[in-house]
């Protein structure tokens, strides 16, 4: 099938060709005696698998949009309620220096150290992440919420797009995988049926010749 788009003045803008699976459709509805019932069944299952996969695309896109909206609100709330602060390491004995780690162990990029920080005039303490070799009295950057509690760094807003893409792609791939698995299972069963039919015909032929 050839489709052509034109502008308001009638000038040709774009011409493209859309190829439809005519052979598969004709196989389903053909009355050719050479087309076996198993062939028609396989063609029907194939069409159903392709149709389901295509129909899943708009639902996957809608799911991705919903995930993006939801995650965007979450990340925006994190950006508004989480703030950077500075904590002071308070216990030297709990700090592991990078030179004391075992030589066979992989190098560590972060360690956990006890520290304290002040937010809105209230002093708090807890375990924070720091670089190896951090000593007592050193200052490390942390993130806290509006109540001064230690939290993770807020996620960048662009992550919502990645989450949406992964959700949409994951949904579509799941449905397509199930459809493909059912098609493969159907083909395997039909191959066994065809082989059994061929064997039956061959056995019947030998019996007739005797």
Swiss-Prot record:
InterPro entries assigned: MT1774/Rv1733c-like (IPR039708)
Biotechnology comment: Has strong T-cell and IFN-gamma inducing capacity in human tuberculin skin test positive patients, indicating this might be a good vaccine candidate. Has also been seen to serve as an immunogenic antigen, inducing gamma-interferon responses in whole-blood cultures from M.tuberculosis-exposed adults in Uganda, The Gambia and South Africa, also indicating this might be a good vaccine candidate.
Keyword vocabulary terms for this entry: Cell membrane, Membrane, Transmembrane, Transmembrane helix
An example Gene Ontology CC term for this record: plasma membrane
Membrane-crossing segments per the record: 43-63, 165-185
Subcellular location(s) of the protein: Cell membrane
Topology in the lipid bilayer: Multi-pass membrane protein
Induction section of the entry: A member of the dormancy regulon. Induced in response to reduced oxygen tension (hypoxia), low levels of nitric oxide (NO) and carbon monoxide (CO). It is hoped that this regulon will give insight into the latent, or dormant phase of infection.
Database matches in PANTHER family: MEMBRANE PROTEIN RV1733C-RELATED (PTHR42305:SF1)
The protein's name in its UniProt record: Probable membrane protein Rv1733c
Native species: Mycobacterium tuberculosis (strain ATCC 25618 / H37Rv)
């Amino acid at each position: 099938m050839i489709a052509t788009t034109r502008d308001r003045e009638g000038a040709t803008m774009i011409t493209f060709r859309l190829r439809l699976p005519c052979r598969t459709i004709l196989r389903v509805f053909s009355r050719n005696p050479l087309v076996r019932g198993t062939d028609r069944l396989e063609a029907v299952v194939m069409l159903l698998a392709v149709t389901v996969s295509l129909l899943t695309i708009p639902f996957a896109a809608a799911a991705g949009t919903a995930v993006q909206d939801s995650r965007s609100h979450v990340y925006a709330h994190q950006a508004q309620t989480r703030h950077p602060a500075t904590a002071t390491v308070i216990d030297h004995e709990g700090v592991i220096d990078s030179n004391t780690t075992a030589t066979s162990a992989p190098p560590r990029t972060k360690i956990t150290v006890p520290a304290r920080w002040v937010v809105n005039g209230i002093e708090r303490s807890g375990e924070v992440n720091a670089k190896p070799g951090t000593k007592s009295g050193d200052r490390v950057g942390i993130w806290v919420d509006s109540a001064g509690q230690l939290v993770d760094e807020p996620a960048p807003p662009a992550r919502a797009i990645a989450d949406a893409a992964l959700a949409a792609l994951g949904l579509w791939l799941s449905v397509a995988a199930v459809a493909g698995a059912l098609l493969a299972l159907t083909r395997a069963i039909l191959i066994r049926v065809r082989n059994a039919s061929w064997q039956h015909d061959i056995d019947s032929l030998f019996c007739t010749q005797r």
